[in-house]
A protein has these predicted regions:
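N-terminal targeting signals for export/organelle localization
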Residues: 1-45
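Anionic-ligand binding region
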Residues: 43, 47-56, 60
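Short active-site neighborhood of thiol/selenol oxidoreductases, capturing the structured segment around
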Residues: 58-69
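The canonical Cys-X-X-Cys-His
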Residues: 72-75, 117
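Typically the conserved alpha-helix immediately C-terminal to a functionally engaged Cys/Sec
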Residues: 76-88
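Thiol-based oxidoreductase modules, predominantly thioredoxin-like and allied folds used
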Residues: 90-104
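Structural micro-motif
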Residues: 110-118
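Non-catalytic, surface beta->alpha helical segment in thiol-disulfide oxidoreductase systems
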Residues: 119-154
């Protein structure tokens, strides 16, 4: 009987952890603008990505910077979602970066898993991030929260 209780308890804990992980996957987390505004110049500069670092132009409204790896299946799904959004809304850009080729940026932004997507404003400042596979709903919510005027203005 005690073994059965232990097995049931372990299954309950594993299920709870799995549901928690799934709920967090791909969810948008905004960067607090008051922290950036009050940060020293060198820290604020670290939260900005330039066209040279990206190797591509910034979107007029927002840019999704997706950090991926070659063997990452969720990265391909996230790429498809973001590419579709960019094709549907003017002023958006999507840049995919291989983590192996951009270790400096991986360290700078604390990328711990792929895919991780940073959302940049029109000036290249990181305004939010999504860790894990991103679906359309989470990507649209990120734009709504970060773009002046929301998605309808994009």
């Amino acid at each position: 009987m005690p073994r059965l209780v232990l097995v049931v308890a372990l299954l309950a804990v594993a299920t709870a952890l799995g549901l928690w992980w799934r709920a967090r996957n791909g969810r948008y987390t905004a960067v607090d603008p008051t922290l950036l505004a009050s940060a020293p110049a060198d820290v604020a500069d670290d939260s900005r990505l330039t066209v040279d670092e990206l190797g591509a132009p910034l979107g007029a409204r927002a840019t999704f910077v997706q950090f991926s790896s070659e063997v990452c299946a969720p990265c391909r799904r996230t790429h498809a979602v973001l590419a579709q959004l960019v094709s549907e809304h003017e002023g958006l850009s999507h840049v995919e970066m291989d983590v192996v080729e951009h270790l400096d940026l991986v360290r700078r932004f604390g990328i711990m898993r792929t895919p991780t997507t940073l959302l940049l404003d029109a000036h290249g400042v990181v305004v939010g991030r999504m860790s894990g596979a991103t679906d359309r709903r989470h990507a649209l919510a990120a734009l709504e929260a970060s773009c002046p005027g929301g998605v309808s203005a994009v």
